[in-house]
A protein has these predicted regions:
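Short, flexible, glycine/charge-rich loop motifs used to bind or transfer phosphoryl groups or to couple energy/partner
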Residues: 1-3, 43-45, 86-87, 125
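Residue-level preference for short coil/turn positions at secondary-structure junctions
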Residues: 5, 48-50, 92
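Active-site-proximal loop/helix of nucleotide/amide-processing enzymes and allied scaffolds
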Residues: 15, 58-60, 70-151
């Protein structure tokens, strides 16, 4: 589960389902399903430091892969949206679900969280990829930008 920052961007696609039949890929139907899948990637950091992971989906909503796009400090993480978008292009994704954790346990979106979402949405629109959701995770709860009408 190494971060895919500047190298190996295609590894996420190769590692997740490259040879799998499309019908065997997990289909994401809800933010709860996204949370349940994503939470497993945050096991080592949920209460210690922030990380940002992205899920990449095909046009049918089936999971192509999951990639760590940033690991940072206790209260914030820096996300380069170009990395998120590049990985989406390499994996031939039609949609992205961005996520990050709040070690504080709060599911309240911050101004930087909102700014990141806005910037990523603009980037996605420019290249024909849909930002499907941005999920803020804690140990026992989550906030979905889509569910809250914030996307």
């Amino acid at each position: 589960r190494d971060c895919l920052l500047s190298r190996g961007l295609g590894d996420v696609y190769k590692r997740q389902y490259k040879d799998a039949d499309a019908s065997k890929r997990v289909r994401i139907h809800s933010s709860k399903e996204s949370y349940d899948i994503l939470k497993t990637f945050y096991e080592d950091c949920m209460q210690h430091h922030e990380e940002c992971w992205a899920m990449y989906l095909n046009g049918a909503g089936r999971l192509l892969g999951v990639s760590c796009v940033s690991r940072s400090g206790m209260n914030s993480t820096v996300v380069d949206i170009r990395i998120v978008l590049q990985t989406a292009l390499v994996s031939h994704a039609s949609g992205i679900i961005l996520s990050h954790n709040h070690p504080s346990g709060s599911t309240v979106a911050s101004t930087p969280d909102n700014n990141l979402t806005s910037q990523l949405k603009k980037g996605c629109e420019a290249i024909g990829i849909q930002l499907l959701d941005h999920i803020i995770l804690t140990e026992d709860a989550y906030l979905s930008y889509m569910d809250e009408g914030m996307l």
